[in-house]
């Protein structure tokens, strides 16, 4: 019996390996519809009442989707953001339905939010209740940072959006989108392309570039990534607020204060976008509780830290599964635990610094900015190398550079049709 099970498992694994190695280019319809399909599964499986049935249906749907995608298709750079959102939707669904019950765990904290508790609804129709549950589910799955919900990120910045009228909000965000594109083009044309090798139609091994060039290119790409993410976020805000599906106060700035960039911990915890923070925090809490770690202990603090970055690594590795890179695919995962290790070293240095009587001040923070710049441009070289290896900087389906550096021309490079829509799900 045991031999049969092992033989059957081995043959199945070999069949999957063969299918994985003989995958075809992802069809156009799939590149445009996969992320909405994943989101639709998440929204629709929230509609049935709590119980094992919807968990089984959801697990079956997500498992089937992933098995089909991973064994049949490969994609290109334009699918980068879709891969991240597909795995993020899956992980968030598992946390909601397997590790909890969304109807109990989540509720809105504003009067404008939809509630699924009906007061005096003896005569309420099933259709009305179903539509209310659908609206609530859409609002829940459209909110990843918790604005207006009981899981709001306490580090969210608050700005002019709190007092702006709808018209002022739309105009200011449209202007910022145009400004971001202008700045990004300037950075690409006069800085990034100046450091990029002038090799037409040639593969560039990012790790072979001079050290200073690599650090400079990574820093510039970080700037361009932040501008791209900010623009997509603002486009989503214009859509939702313009259609009266949301209000300006639910769209605080995507990024935190640049003055906090004196530690790597602050980079990831306060400055960079916090779209997936709740996923990482929830996973860390589950592991910490499983270890019976008490709040305030080192075990509690660092189990949550490392689990959060490991989950982020898995999230980023989804890109390498769908967009193969023999040289840099592994880096999409290991970059995240590397940041956790740097944060640990930071904590040790801060502890012994305090013991030695070193006080926080301008000079210490100046050193912190240098520290953060060094480690970020060193480790972020892994995903930049990945993008380079899959043709992201040479015009082959480029998803971030609007123009290839081989010519610095004005030719527009096609991107995934749902790159913008991906970012709409999760920025409220």
From Swiss-Prot:
Q: Which residues are glycosylated?
A: 8
| SS bonds (residue pairs) | none
Q: Which residue ranges does UniProt annotate as crossing the membrane?
A: 33-53, 55-75, 78-98, 305-325, 329-349, 366-386
Primary location class = membrane
- Mutant lacking the gene: phenotype: Fully eliminates the production of asperlin.
The GO cellular component terms are: membrane
Give the EC class as a word. Answer: transferase
| Membrane topology, from the record | Multi-pass membrane protein
* Gene Ontology biological process terms from the UniProt entry: lipid metabolic process
Matching entries from InterPro entries are given as:
Wax_synthase, Wax_synthase_dom
> What subcellular locations does the record give?
Membrane
The induction annotation reads: Expression is controlled by the asperlin biosynthesis cluster-specific transcription factor alnR.
Q: Does the keyword Zinc apply?
A: no
- PANTHER family membership: ACETYLTRANSFERASE SIRH, LONG-CHAIN-ALCOHOL O-FATTY-ACYLTRANSFERASE 3-RELATED
Provide the family line. Belongs to the wax synthase family.
* Functional description taken from the UniProt entry: Acetyltransferase; part of the gene cluster that mediates the biosynthesis of asperlin, a polyketide showing anti-inflammatory, antitumor and antibiotic activities. The first step of the asperlin biosynthesis is the production of the intermediate 2,4,6-octatrienoic acid by the highly redusing polyketide synthase alnA with cleavage of the PKS product by the esterase alnB. 2,4,6-octatrienoic acid is further converted to asperlin via several steps involving the remaining enzymes from the cluster.
> What's the protein called, per UniProt?
Acetyltransferase sirH
Top-level taxonomy: Eukaryota, Fungi, Dikarya, Ascomycota, Pezizomycotina
> Which gene codes for it?
alnF
